[in-house]
């Protein structure tokens, strides 16, 4: 039952999201804006849509939960918050992310979304929190007819959106990709350039054993990474961020490396 749900996970998320708006009775302008953005993106399976959903949906859930005490936990607000949280949990599963990134693949590509590095968890949350706070502030000032304040915060929100959304979207563009020629590590966050590993260069792929000495290209993340062993030394160019995390130079010659996809490519 659960596996069948995950196979068609896009539909349960859509149904839950529609149910949220059907049972709610307290949406403000900002909540409606976030709900509409996420709802529209849920029908467009693509990495851009995944970013839009994962940026907008948490705001709806956060507002629904924050309103529970003021509503004295009446049934309708509780149901609204519960549906929003369940939808949010599904949205952040590896299966849901995989549906979106694979739908944007070309030809015979098979994309595996990479896990977020631990070091980016706090900056990512803070970037989202800034956007959320600014949007809610614009909504509040508009409701109170404080037009000057609303305009000022609105300008700041527009600039922050332009700067931060692009950075957040990069997390949805990090993939391990199976292509006819081999594998590609497509990661503009941790690598200075994408890395193509041809099939004949690969000696083996397996879950990394404890104590492995392979270079970690995952940026340190949760879960067990995949270890790729190469036939000969191969150049890999690190981004300044990964160089700082690994405390190495920006160009390495490696025979073993680690990547951390959200779903195993070893099946």
Residue ranges and their predicted role:
Residues 183-185, 195-212:
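Phosphoinositide-dependent membrane-docking surfaces
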Residues 103-177:
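Anionic N-terminal interaction surfaces
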Residues 164-197:
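Conserved beta-hairpin
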Residues 221-267:
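A membrane-cytosol interface segment of integral membrane proteins
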Residues 29-37, 76-86, 149-158:
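Hydrophobic core segments of alpha-helical transmembrane domains in multi-pass membrane proteins
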Residues 1-72:
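Membrane-anchoring hydrophobic segments
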Residues 1-8, 74-134:
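N-terminal membrane-targeting/pre-transmembrane regions
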Residues 140-161, 213-236:
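Hydrophobic alpha-helical transmembrane segments and immediately flanking/interface helices
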């Amino acid at each position: 039952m659960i596996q069948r749900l995950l196979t068609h996970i896009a539909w349960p998320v859509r149904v839950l999201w529609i149910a949220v708006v059907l049972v709610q009775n307290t949406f403000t302008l900002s909540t409606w804006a976030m709900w509409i953005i996420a709802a529209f993106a849920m029908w467009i399976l693509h990495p851009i849509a995944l970013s839009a959903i994962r940026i907008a949906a948490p705001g709806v859930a956060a507002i629904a939960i924050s309103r529970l005490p003021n509503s004295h936990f009446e049934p309708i607000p509780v149901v609204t918050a519960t549906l929003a949280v369940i939808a949010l949990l599904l949205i952040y599963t590896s299966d849901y992310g995989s549906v979106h990134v694979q739908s944007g693949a070309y030809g015979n590509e098979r994309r595996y979304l990479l896990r977020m590095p631990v070091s980016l968890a706090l900056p990512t949350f803070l970037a989202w929190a800034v956007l959320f706070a600014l949007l809610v502030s614009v909504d509040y000032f508009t409701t109170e007819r404080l037009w000057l304040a609303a305009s000022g915060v609105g300008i700041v929100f527009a600039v922050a959106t332009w700067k931060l959304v692009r950075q957040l979207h990069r997390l949805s563009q990090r993939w391990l990709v199976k292509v006819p020629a081999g594998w590609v590590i497509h990661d503009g966050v941790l690598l200075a350039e994408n890395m193509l590993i041809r099939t004949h260069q690969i000696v083996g792929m397996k879950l990394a054993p404890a104590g492995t000495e392979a270079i970690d290209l995952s940026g340190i993340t949760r879960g067990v990474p995949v270890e790729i062993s190469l036939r000969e030394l191969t150049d890999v160019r690190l981004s300044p961020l990964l160089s700082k995390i690994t405390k190495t130079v920006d160009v390495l010659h490696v025979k073993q490396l680690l990547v951390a996809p959200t779903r195993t490519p070893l099946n």
